[in-house]
Swiss-Prot record:
PROSITE patterns: DAP_EPIMERASE
Function of the protein: Catalyzes the stereoinversion of LL-2,6-diaminopimelate (L,L-DAP) to meso-diaminopimelate (meso-DAP), a precursor of L-lysine and an essential component of the bacterial peptidoglycan.
EC identifiers of the protein: 5.1.1.7
Xref: InterPro entries: DAP_epimerase_AS (IPR018510), DAP_epimerase_DapF (IPR001653)
Alphabetical keyword list: Amino-acid biosynthesis, Cytoplasm, Isomerase, Lysine biosynthesis
Name by which UniProt lists this protein: Diaminopimelate epimerase
Subunit (UniProt): Homodimer.
GO biological process, one term: lysine biosynthetic process via diaminopimelate
SUPFAM superfamilies referenced in this protein's UniProt entry, alphabetically: Diaminopimelate epimerase-like (SSF54506)
Keyword GTP-binding set for record: no
Marked site (Could be important to modulate the pK values of the two catalytic cysteine residues) residue numbers: H167, E216
Amino acid sequence: MRVEFTKYQGLGNDFILIDNRHQAQPCLTPDQAVQMCDRNFGIGGDGVIFALPPEGDTDYTMRIYNSDGSEPEMCGNGIRCLARFLAHLEGKPLQTDITYRIHTLAGTITPSLQADGLVKVDMGPPFLVPQEIPTTLGEGTDPVVNQPLEVAGQSWPVTCVSMGNPHCITFVDDLEAIDFQTLGPQFEHHPVFPQRINTEFIQVIRPDYLKMLVWERGAGPTLACGTGACAVLVAGVLTGKSQSQATIELPGGPLQIRWAGEGQSVFMTGPAEKVFTGIYETG
């Protein structure tokens, strides 16, 4: 089968975008997505994103397969790329103001293309109740903030946030001192996270400027994670380490994140750029 695709990237977090508006289910299997994401034998990417017909009062539906074939609830960098892709499919100019309502497995997400080329996304309010994340850390409905978690023989203070997908955030003194490749998988598969977890290691440079390394569930180390950056700001506010608006510096570049407090939406602003188009022959 021949599949037309367009590759996009948001701060180096790269995705294969497919026009799937003709049917409600993805036109590829998870195994085929794994093959496409292979950086040696395929196109290469952190995931495959499908633009599907709308559900309810939305404009489109988003589905995504990670590079390991798993399906996350949504993806922050990915939805910025999807918004750019949809504008391209609709023949909209690059410098345009347009807002989409996108149905995802995490609910309705609203990205807005801006005239300056950036994409601002209303990510909705964060989920802080342990059962909603989900995690077995903590009790009842109290947020998991600075709770100790034993990983690799060390106790880590962690804060848990869901942006529709689960995140575990830990603040450290020096990111360069972190054994990232060893710790990432151990956090991801820790038994207190029944659906596994995305993990962010954070160094606070200033209350309005935080540096972040991310280990993504199902993808491993990536250059950027939009939902992760949103979760980091929420964790920073909850722990008193950051302001309500801050720059989150990822290996691929900065995202601007804003959160006014409990019950309020988190807003993310950042780039999404087209890389190339092509045709892929599936096996």
